[in-house]
Regions:
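Structured, charged N-terminal subsegments at the starts of enzyme catalytic cores
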Residues: 75-76, 81-83
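Juxtacatalytic substrate-recognition/specificity segment
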Residues: 83-163
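Extended, low-hydrophobicity, Ser/Thr/Pro/Gly-biased non-transmembrane segments
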Residues: 1-75
Length: 163
């Protein structure tokens, strides 16, 4: 069964669970993120495929199937954003909650080296990585850590002093 979802952004930078979404049957799997005056200056980051989005990422996203739809977390809010390409795959890094002294360029350079080593190891035969793009979503908090890997993204938490 195909599913589509519509989500109006709330007044906080968090993703509402699927239970909070208003879903209706469609011919494709989709998620629509609607901006509002409360989301002025916010951006969206997700591993979902953008179908029709504005400059900040609000709009319509699609997924090939339901499993992909529910395995792509969404980050909404004010955050730093940077990118690099490894093995022909664009990688994006978004960081929410970092101090103004945060060194984004160093984080990108270090992460790029790790991704280059991983792709060289797992794809030494020259095969392409299994994703079209990859998104790192890092939430910086006072004192915590953790993360969860997804199909083409990862949702991470770290303490401010770790940056």
């Amino acid at each position: 069964m195909a599913r589509g979802c519509r989500l109006a952004a709330r007044a906080f930078p968090a993703y509402a669970g699927l239970g909070d979404l208003l879903c209706a049957s469609h011919h494709r799997h989709a998620l629509e993120l609607l901006g509002s005056p409360a989301t002025e200056g916010w951006q969206v980051a997700t591993g979902l495929t953008p179908a029709q989005v504005d400059a900040n990422g609000f709009g319509l996203y699609t997924a090939a199937h339901y499993d992909e739809l529910v395995d792509c977390p969404v980050e909404m809010g004010r955050f730093w954003r940077g990118s690099f390409t490894v093995g022909g795959v664009p990688h994006e890094f978004v960081v929410a909650g970092a101090a103004p002294s945060f060194d984004g360029e160093r984080l990108l350079a270090d992460t790029q080296k790790i991704c280059e080593a991983e792709i060289a190891f797992w794809h030494a035969d020259g095969s392409q990585p299994p994703m079209d793009r990859y998104v790192f979503m890092l939430n910086v908090v006072d004192d915590n850590y953790g993360g969860l890997e997804h199909r083409n993204s990862t949702a991470l938490i770290c303490g401010r002093r770790d940056l």
